[in-house]
Amino acid sequence: MSEKPLIWLGDSRETIRAFADDVRKIAGFQLWRVQRGLEPNDWKPMPSVGLGVQEIRIHTGTEHRVLYVAKFAEAVYVLHAFEKRTRRMPQDDLHVARQRLRLLINQRARRKG
């Protein structure tokens, strides 16, 4: 099975690098699964962000989320990562993910010309 490359949008890579070691390792392993065409162990679709966007859910005493889109053949795009501090999805984080997805879709459309 071929492995899709990861493309990090915005500060998503730096954010994951700043997570605690255990969280970072879990996030890395789950993204590796996605690159191989497998589902993460704990995920849910995020249609409120956009079609095909999914959320990796990481539970380690604190809650962390990684939002990505893997529906494109060329790569897995990591849209956003954050620590979730409330039960509800923070609107600021949803906004960031939507904005990055919109930029990605526009860039892909320009490349196809």
Task: Locate each region found by the language model.
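Basic, Lys/Arg-enriched alpha-helical interface segments
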Residues: 1-63, 72-76, 83-113
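Short, surface-exposed charged micro-motifs
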Residues: 67
